[in-house]
């Protein structure tokens, strides 16, 4: 007879009886923030290509933004294997939907709703998919941008960010985002946010992709890196005038 | 075998006697009391002629705003000011203490205080308390060797930086600095950038709020701009004003004088040997 101890919340992990060890307790390979904004023609989403294994930068070529069907982009931060699982679920969903062969296709709102249900139900069973997902898309001329977290919190907004992006990128977006940004302005704004994240998030790497979705379809850019500036005189000689300090 | 325990007065510094008891209690499940934290955004930046320090003005006690307009920029010396984040009592006490020490030092040496003196005094104190004095400080000033800006962490480590942020709103403020800081800012550009970063903390962090305080220190001159910006004014004031209950009526006035003091001189008996 398996004894079931009431799970006590201890920060990130959950203590349970040994027999039931098939639940996600903590993430292993993780992706860092995603930043996304609505712009004039659709949605822009930026992410870097790093996958960290704890404090090691293990994988430097992970695409964390994928196209879903014709109308949506899904970006994920958190556990990479759970993201791949979600992509499989969405594959099945879009395949089943295709088989109806009625000319309809799943739009971003529908996929967002599906993902919300999946994440919330998994969380209710104490077996979460350890991701924060960003869903952006355009259907029938209307752009859509939403977010689902691993506990099932879901909402829509004009600009979203996950993980560290919440603290570092959102203040910039709240100040400088406005409706009907042009493509160039949108990319500049995203790059501004990604640069701050690069300076201040330890798991960020300088290799990012920006994905764009419009009524015409999805384009994911080639990976590229941002220019950084390290030439402040105080950085060169921090103890000038304060000899012996650090 | 004599069991004499002489009470030796503690030699000063932190007394670790109760730590074992506290450990035992936490293992039994007792939660330690939490501190009044300032939940803050404090920033400093070096511009062309000196240093600009900025701070918000909200002090929180858990989820409640305890003080809507507190002062987080503390005076250390005429040419040195220090912003404090963390436990309010700790920041007040430690900056006050070092401020007095600096004053005495000024009398003794006959010279203006230097920023690294304040830095070393603070750092030594905080390190010896192993992080239990929960004060995170942004120390800035202009002395004979030039403008300086340092951050001091509760465990006693320090950084020397061109721009710095501390407190719960530090990430929001740092994102503004990282995006917009340049070297050689003028006074007005510097004040604008500091105000922008404090506002970023005020509007994006729940632990920071109310107004922006700014302090500009240059060679031989300092300006303490208390409530430089008030982006959260009270917009609704009821036009009805306050109405108290109906007039109080005086029913009775009675004055009872205190009893007269009576001196009793007793002729006591002489003490027996």
From Swiss-Prot, chain B:
Gene3D superfamilies: Glutamine Phosphoribosylpyrophosphate, subunit 1, domain 1. Pfam families: Proteasome. Its EC number is 3.4.25.1. GO terms for cellular component: cytosol; nucleus; proteasome complex; proteasome core complex, beta-subunit complex. InterPro entries: Ntn_hydrolases_N, Pept_T1A_subB, Proteasome_bsu_CS, Proteasome_sua/b, Proteasome_suB-type. Keywords: Cytoplasm, Hydrolase, Nucleus, Protease, Proteasome, Threonine protease, Zymogen. It comes from the Eukaryota. It is found in: Cytoplasm; Nucleus. GO terms for biological process: proteolysis involved in protein catabolic process. It catalyses: Cleavage of peptide bonds with very broad specificity. Residues 1-37 form a propeptide. The active site is at 40 (nucleophile). GO terms for molecular function: threonine-type endopeptidase activity. Belongs to the peptidase T1B family. The proteasome is a multicatalytic proteinase complex which is characterized by its ability to cleave peptides with Arg, Phe, Tyr, Leu, and Glu adjacent to the leaving group at neutral or slightly basic pH. The proteasome has an ATP-dependent proteolytic activity. Component of the 20S core complex of the 26S proteasome. The 26S proteasome is composed of a core protease (CP), known as the 20S proteasome, capped at one or both ends by the 19S regulatory particle (RP/PA700). The 20S proteasome core is composed of 28 subunits that are arranged in four stacked rings, resulting in a barrel-shaped structure. The two end rings are each formed by seven alpha subunits, and the two central rings are each formed by seven beta subunits. The catalytic chamber with the active sites is on the inside of the barrel. This is Proteasome subunit beta type-7-A. It comes from Arabidopsis thaliana (Mouse-ear cress).
């Amino acid at each position: 007879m398996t004894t079931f101890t009431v799970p006590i919340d201890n920060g990130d992990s959950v203590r349970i009886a040994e027999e039931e060890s098939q639940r996600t307790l903590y993430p292993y390979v993780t992706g860092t923030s995603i930043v996304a904004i609505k712009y004039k023609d659709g949605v822009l989403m930026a992410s870097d290509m790093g996958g960290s294994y704890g404090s090691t930068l293990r994988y430097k070529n992970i695409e964390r933004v994928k196209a879903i069907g014709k109308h949506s982009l899904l970006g994920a931060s958190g556990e990479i294997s759970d993201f791949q699982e979600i992509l499989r679920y969405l594959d099945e969903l879009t395949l089943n939907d295709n088989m109806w062969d009625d000319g309809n296709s799943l739009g971003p709102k529908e996929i967002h709703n599906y993902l919300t249900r999946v994440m919330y139900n998994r969380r209710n069973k104490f077996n979460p998919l350890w991701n924060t997902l960003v869903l952006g898309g355009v259907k029938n001329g209307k752009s859509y941008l939403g977010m689902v977290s691993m506990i099932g919190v879901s909402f829509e907004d004009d600009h979203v960010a996950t993980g560290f992006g919440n603290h570092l990128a959102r203040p910039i977006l709240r100040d400088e985002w406005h409706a009907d940004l042009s493509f160039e302005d949108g990319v500049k704004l995203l790059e501004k946010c990604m640069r701050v994240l690069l300076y201040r998030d330890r798991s960020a790497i300088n290799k990012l992709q920006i994905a764009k979705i419009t009524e015409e379809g999805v384009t994911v850019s080639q990976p590229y890196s941002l220019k950084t500036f390290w030439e402040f005189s105080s950085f060169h000689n921090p103890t000038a005038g304060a000899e012996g300090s650090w | 075998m004599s069991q004499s325990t002489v009470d030796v007065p503690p030699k000063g510094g932190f007394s670790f006697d109760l730590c074992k008891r506290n450990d035992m209690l936490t293992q039994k499940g007792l939660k330690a009391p939490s501190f009044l934290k300032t939940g803050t955004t404090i920033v400093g930046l070096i511009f062309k002629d000196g240093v600009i320090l900025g701070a918000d003005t909200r002090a929180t006690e858990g989820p409640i705003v305890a003080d809507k307009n507190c002062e987080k920029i503390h005076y250390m010396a005429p040419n040195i000011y220090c912003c404090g984040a963390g436990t309010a009592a700790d920041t007040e006490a430690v900056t006050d203490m070092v401020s007095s020490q600096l004053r005495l030092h000024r009398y003794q040496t006959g010279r203006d205080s230097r920023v690294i003196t304040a830095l070393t005094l603070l750092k030594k104190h905080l390190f010896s308390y192993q992080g239990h004095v929960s004060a995170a400080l942004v120390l800035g000033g202009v002395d004979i060797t030039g403008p300086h800006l340092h951050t001091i962490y509760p465990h006693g480590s320090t950084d020397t930086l061109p721009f710095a942020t501390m407190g719960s709103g530090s990430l929001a403020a740092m994102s503004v600095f990282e995006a917009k800081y340049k070297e050689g800012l003028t006074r007005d550009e510097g004040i604008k950038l500091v105000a922008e970063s404090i506002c970023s903390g005020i509007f994006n962090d729940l632990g920071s709020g109310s107004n922006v305080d700014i302090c500009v220190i240059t060679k031989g001159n300092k300006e303490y701009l208390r409530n430089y910006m008030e982006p959260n004014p009270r917009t609704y004031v009821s036009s009805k004003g306050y109405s108290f209950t109906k007039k109080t009526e005086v029913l009775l006035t009675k004055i009872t004088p205190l009893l007269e003091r009576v001196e009793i001189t007793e002729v006591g008996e002489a003490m027996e040997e």
